């Protein structure tokens, strides 16, 4: 049956003599159109298949396209009655396998092999595909370059090199200079003229004017950005003031503060617009302060709440802009920019030397890597030489049409190469793609190339160029397309994403599902409320998984109908119809284990990141302490591992020997004792020293195998869950170490850094996961892996987890295709703080916007994979000051004129921030209700439903005992023994073990871990672990030598605000006697890197000032030496003291914690603890009483610790309630 194409599809198939750009939305049939165009050109235009160049993004796509074209040609041949035409088709079929329907890399390889003589390279080369070997060659090349500079007799050249490395000497990452050079390589290799690009790195730093305001960077980039930001704020302020009736008594008291702020803001905006000198603008912006407190007024409560939001938005914007662009004076910026020009030039020089040396090493080995193929092919086609002329002429005459699939994922080099294949004046370029699905920025893809052509080809006067838009979606049901449009209407705009989704990007439902079929008709927002849910890591918790498993079980139990295109009929959904999409694969093994526990079959499409597995964490930690044992985190990781099995209480006892030295020093001291634990310490230290000695005279691979043998670690991990996979991973590390040494490297420290860099660059060495084919199983994969695929039912998980883009926009440098941003320790001779150059400040914003745009596009890809049912699953974290209804109302208000503002989009920290405003607004406007999981039924009306998961009512069902017993039927003899042992342990745990409660806690507790006994609301928010597989086993594994996460986040939780408030009060200097110094204290913490700009702007400074000015604090100024803040303590307690349900257990628990503050008065101690909990002003007395009850136990712990320390007795205990400005005594 002939395929019926839409008018736009027909134009794309039939148009000739024009360069065409097809913008094909998800599910719009672009591959079918591309294949049909090829067939028509062969059949109707009589083009030979070898006269077409078809570039695809992946080898799989190329193979599929060849197969489709071959099948279509075979079908036409069978129908053909004309003999000459049949002969022509047979020739095309014979040539199809050699036709250039391939990836860009494969085509470039053809260019090099055919015209190698144009660039004078040895034609007998091979392709280096092993990522490890490539990294090793890079390492060797950079080492050679470093040595060459250090030994260079040209002192000026040597000084430039040393200046480059010295510029990063104070950075927290000791390898920052080398990381910059490796990162520069990735960007440079994606440029059509990388030498020119590198040489321009210093351009933004070379000021041509005396005032930075007159510079090109300021005028073309920074000024327009600032004008837009402050215009947005001014509009909000104007709207608010227009709403207020300042003539009325209720509003009048708010007028002075808003008027003053509006006036100062207007003065700054005028100064910015008229290009006043930089220092004048700086002065005016600093004066934009909002004075006064907005106290609650019940009569105009809505106005006051809105006023508070505008005030906070203004304060935050002023603070962020000042600290980003105006923190340094004009003179200081000139000094910083001059330094930036020097370092950027040096970086370009060293980078070029590194590239040249890397190329020399590859040529000597007669190998090329993938970046060489594109660079060399481009060089062949662009050189001004007779041989290059010959190459260009060959391809330009051969290819009658150039077709590029997935054009949105090309980079500048690839695009430049494609353009060189076109003959001047000949319009024979066909490009198809979808900028909304450009998700490969980490591979240097540049969606801006697509956007530029999209705009150019869409103009009426674009002669020889045409843009065609495929809007019809033939994949998804109407509820899916409606939900996608609902979300992205507000999200993708010309200033964010480069396309106006409302006008040009919406999906048009065209799937043609049978309207009579009782198919699932609603897209679901499946959520649960969680006041303890964290959203600052990428780990999925069991609550997320239980919710999804429960919903899958119900879909299967209800026999939810889906349409089967193979039979043309509906049938019940099966596990194999369902896909789960996640942002990353870090939780895949945990998800697999949880699904196995509930008996839901799951096929994992990706393995867990190799370097984050438990076994690699332990072994790499062991190598680190063999190289240098004076590292707390890796040392404790090894001690706590199954190799040595030190318990938490063992580690606590060792640490208490001396808390002021490194853990290694404490361990050596403790080993001198005469106890069993000390003997174990001595055994460990002896083995460690043996291995350290061994490492000095043996290869790294030999050291690794010796560790495996002496510790039996291979056998240990083999006995664990997924044991065979873990063993393969350890073997892979041994093989990589051997490869590292075969390239001439021997140093253990450098090997550790090499592995760290591979981890940073996501070079995965994992062995393929051992799994059978998917079969009838739920499929789990990353969103990236799902691109191009489709599934009847799609779950999107992890919407509440924070993005990890901060690592790309913090540190000593920011790198992007548009340039290099640098910051420096400043002043240069004193290095008091790290200062941004203007170039770095701007690039941070520009790169953050690019990263967030890509995250939005990634969401689009995820949502458009669903054919018949889409389920968005989120664990919604409730802020301390609001309930879900209040949160939804706040979200809905963010939609202005149907869209999110750019300012709001730039604040996004997680996928839910993108989705929630549009969903909440739709719920509000359309008056959509909510349903429980248990109330869901098939074939319901509507396109969107909010489904509340209640863990108590909607619990996922575990397999019954018969099913569990049956699951052991196919076990091996050894596995059956383990199964029986597990059953014994289960029975034992239900019976008479006398100390069962003790097995459910540890002998080492932190106050932060037992606060839930006293009801602390932020305990879970503050929890964090960077080594997930060791988290529950060991408290010492937290990264205590790294900066807290809140230093780098742009949006913050109530827990982080509380922590930041504590920090300010910890460092506030009472000795200076200045009660108005809170602002300077905060500024100092920001300058020293202890506090982020975002957090500083959101602190309740009025509350902090209130406390330091209070009567309670007056003695602190008179005798500051008697004030103690952030005092650590440790005490031994009976378990029953902490846990009222604890059975009689003879052991003790070590509790450690930190006391906010106490003051030693003449006759005793005054103990106090800061709290930032929200206090409802309407029920203040009741709320305060609850807080006193909640924290009474915690303060008693502190009191006991102080009394046992031999100090004066504790006289009184107080809670300092910052939110309501009250200090209350606790019994």
Curated annotation (Swiss-Prot):
Q: Which SUPFAM superfamilies match?
A: P-loop containing nucleoside triphosphate hydrolases, Restriction endonuclease-like
Keyword Transport attributed:
no
- UniProt-listed Gene3D superfamilies: 3.90.320.10, P-loop containing nucleotide triphosphate hydrolases (3.40.50.300)
Q: Which residues belong to any copy of the UvrD-like helicase ATP-binding domain?
A: 3-477
Reaction catalysed by this chain? Answer: Couples ATP hydrolysis with the unwinding of duplex DNA by translocating in the 3'-5' direction; ATP + H2O = ADP + phosphate + H(+)
Q: Where does ATP bind?
A: 24-31
Which InterPro entries does the annotation name? AddA, DNA_helicase_UvrD-like_C, DNA_helicase_UvrD/REP, P-loop_NTPase, PDDEXK-like_dom_sf, PDDEXK_AddAB-type, Restrct_endonuc-II-like, UvrD-like_ATP-bd
Q: Which GO terms describe its cellular component?
A: cytosol; DNA helicase complex
Query: In what residue span(s) does the UvrD-like helicase C-terminal domain sit?
Result: 505-788
- Oligomer status and interactors: Heterodimer of AddA and AddB/RexB.
Recorded family membership: Belongs to the helicase family. AddA subfamily.
What protein name applies here?
ATP-dependent helicase/nuclease subunit A
| Organism (species) | Lactobacillus delbrueckii subsp. bulgaricus (strain ATCC BAA-365 / Lb-18)
């Amino acid at each position: 049956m002939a395929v019926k194409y839409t008018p736009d599809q027909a134009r794309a198939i039939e148009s000739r003599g024009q360069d065409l750009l097809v913008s094909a939305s998800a599910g719009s049939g672009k591959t079918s159109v591309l294949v049909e165009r090829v067939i028509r050109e062969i059949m109707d235009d009589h083009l030979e298949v070898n006269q077409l160049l078809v570039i695809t993004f992946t080898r799989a796509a190329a193979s599929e396209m060849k197969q489709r074209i071959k099948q279509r040609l075979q079908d036409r041949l069978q129908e053909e009655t004309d003999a000459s035409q049949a002969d022509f088709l047979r020739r095309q079929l014979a040539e199809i396998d050699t036709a250039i329907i391939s990836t860009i890399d494969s085509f470039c390889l053809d260019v090099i092999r055919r015209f190698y003589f144009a660039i004078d390279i040895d034609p007998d080369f091979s392709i280096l595909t092993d990522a490890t070997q490539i990294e090793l060659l890079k390492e060797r090349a950079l080492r050679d370059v470093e040595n060459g500079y250090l030994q260079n007799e040209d002192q000026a050249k040597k000084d430039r090199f040393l200046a480059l490395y010295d510029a990063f000497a104070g950075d927290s990452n000791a390898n920052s200079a080398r990381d910059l050079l490796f990162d520069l390589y990735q960007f440079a290799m994606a440029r059509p003229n990388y030498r020119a690009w590198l040489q321009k790195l210093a351009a933004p730093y070379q000021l041509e004017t005396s005032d930075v305001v007159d510079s090109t960077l300021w005028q073309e980039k920074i000024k327009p950005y600032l004008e837009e930001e402050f215009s947005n704020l001014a509009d909000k302020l104007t709207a608010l003031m227009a709403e207020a009736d300042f003539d009325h008594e209720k509003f009048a008291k708010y007028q002075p503060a808003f008027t003053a702020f509006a006036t100062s803001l207007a003065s700054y905006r005028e100064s910015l617009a008229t290009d006043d000198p930089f220092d004048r603008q700086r002065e005016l912006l600093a004066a934009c302060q909002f004075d006064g407190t907005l106290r609650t007024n019940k009569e105009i409560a809505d106005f006051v709440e809105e006023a508070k939001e505008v005030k906070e938005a203004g304060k935050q914007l002023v603070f962020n802009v000042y600290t980003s662009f105006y923190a340094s004076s004009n003179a200081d910026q000139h000094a910083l920019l001059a330094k930036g020009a020097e370092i950027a030039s040096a970086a370009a020089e060293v980078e070029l030397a590194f590239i040249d040396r890397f190329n020399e090493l590859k040529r000597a080995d007669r190998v090329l890597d993938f970046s060489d193929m594109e660079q060399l092919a481009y060089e062949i086609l662009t050189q001004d030489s007779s041989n290059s002329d010959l190459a260009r002429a060959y391809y330009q005459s051969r290819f009658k049409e150039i077709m590029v699939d997935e054009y949105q994922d090309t980079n500048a080099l690839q695009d430049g190469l494609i353009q060189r294949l076109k003959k001047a004046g000949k319009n024979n370029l066909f490009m198809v793609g979808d900028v909304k699905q450009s998700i490969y920025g980490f591979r240097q893809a540049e969606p801006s190339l697509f956007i530029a052509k999209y705009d150019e080809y869409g103009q009426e006067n674009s002669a020889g160029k045409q843009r065609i838009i495929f809007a019809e979606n033939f994949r998804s049901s109407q509820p899916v397309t409606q939900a996608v449009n609902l979300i992205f209407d507000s999200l993708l705009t010309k200033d964010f994403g480069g396309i106006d989704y409302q006008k040009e990007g919406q999906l048009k439902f065209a799937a043609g599902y049978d309207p009579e079929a009782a198919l699932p008709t609603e897209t679901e927002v499946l959520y649960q409320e969680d006041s303890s849910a964290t959203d600052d890591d990428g780990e999925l918790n069991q609550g997320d998984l239980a919710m999804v498993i429960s919903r899958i079980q119900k879909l299967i139990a209800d026999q939810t109908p889906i349409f089967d295109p193979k039979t043309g009929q509906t049938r019940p959904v099966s596990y194999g119809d369902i896909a789960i999409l996640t942002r990353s694969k870090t939780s895949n093994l945990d998800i697999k284990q949880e699904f196995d526990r509930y008996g839901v079959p799951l096929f994992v499409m990706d393995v867990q990141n190799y370097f984050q597995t438990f076994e690699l964490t332990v072994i790499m930690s062991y190598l680190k302490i063999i190289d240098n044992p004076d590292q707390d985190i890796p040392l404790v990781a090894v001690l706590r591992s199954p190799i040595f099995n030190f318990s938490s209480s063992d580690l606590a006892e060792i640490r208490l020997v001396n808390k002021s030295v490194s853990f290694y020093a404490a361990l050596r001291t403790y080993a001198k004792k005469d106890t069993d634990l000390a003997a174990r310490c001595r055994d460990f230290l002896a083995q460690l020293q043996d291995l350290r000695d061994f490492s000095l005279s043996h290869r790294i691979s030999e050291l690794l195998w010796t560790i495996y043998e002496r510790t039996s670690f291979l056998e240990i991990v083999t006995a664990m869950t997924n044991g065979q996979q873990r063993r393969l991973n350890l073997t892979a590390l041994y093989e990589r170490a051997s490869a590292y040494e075969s390239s001439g490297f021997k140093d253990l420290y450098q090997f550790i850094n090499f592995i760290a860099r591979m981890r940073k660059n996501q070079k995965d060495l994992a062995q393929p996961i051992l799994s059978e084919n998917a079969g009838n199983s739920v499929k789990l994969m990353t969103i990236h892996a799902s691109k191009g695929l489709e599934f009847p039912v799609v779950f999107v998980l992890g919407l509440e987890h924070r993005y990890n883009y901060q690592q790309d926009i913090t540190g000593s440098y920011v790198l992007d295709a548009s340039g290099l941003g640098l910051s420096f320790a400043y002043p240069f001779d004193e290095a008091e703080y790290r200062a941004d150059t203007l170039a770095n400040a701007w690039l941070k914003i520009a790169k953050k916007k690019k990263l967030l745009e890509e995250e939005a596009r990634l969401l689009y890809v995820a949502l458009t994979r669903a054919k018949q049912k889409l389920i968005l699953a989120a664990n919604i974290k409730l802020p301390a000051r609001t309930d879900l209804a209040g949160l939804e109302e706040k979200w809905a208000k963010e939609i202005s004129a149907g869209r999110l503002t750019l300012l709001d989009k730039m604040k996004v920290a997680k996928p839910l921030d993108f989705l929630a405003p549009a969903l909440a607004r739709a719920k509000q406007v359309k008056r959509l209700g909510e349903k429980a999981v248990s109330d869901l039924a098939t074939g319901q009306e509507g396109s969107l439903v909010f489904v509340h998961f209640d863990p108590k009512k909607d619990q996922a069902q575990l397999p019954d005992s018969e099913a569990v017993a049956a699951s052991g039927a196919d076990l091996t003899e050894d596995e059956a023994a383990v199964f029986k042992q597990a059953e014994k342990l289960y029975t034992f745990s239900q019976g008479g073990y006398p100390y069962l409660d003790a097995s459910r806690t540890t002998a080492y507790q932190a106050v932060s871990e037992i606060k839930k006994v006293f009801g602390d609301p932020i305990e879970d928010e503050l929890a964090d672990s960077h080594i997930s597989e060791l988290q529950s086993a060991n408290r010492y594994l937290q990264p205590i030598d790294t900066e807290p996460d809140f230093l780098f986040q742009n949006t913050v939780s109530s827990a982080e605000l509380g922590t930041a408030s504590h920090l300010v009060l910890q460092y506030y200097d009472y000795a200076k006697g200045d009660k108005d110094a809170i602002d300077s204290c905060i500024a100092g913490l920001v300058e020293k890197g202890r506090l982020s700009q975002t957090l500083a702007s959101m602190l309740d400074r009025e509350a902090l000032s209130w406390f330091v000015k209070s009567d309670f604090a007056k003695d602190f100024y008179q005798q500051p030496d008697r004030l103690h803040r952030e005092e650590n303590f440790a005490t031994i307690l009976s378990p029953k003291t902490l846990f009222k349900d604890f059975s009689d257990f003879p052991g003790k628990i070590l509790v450690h914690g930190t006391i906010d503050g106490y003051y030693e008065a003449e006759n005793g101690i005054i103990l106090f603890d800061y709290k930032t909990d929200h206090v409802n002003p309407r029920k203040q007395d009741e709320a305060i009483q609850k807080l006193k009850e909640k924290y009474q136990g915690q303060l008693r712990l502190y009191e006991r610790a102080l009394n046992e320390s031999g100090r004066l007795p504790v006289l009184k205990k107080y809670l300092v309630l910052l939110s309501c400005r009250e200090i209350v005594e606790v019994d």
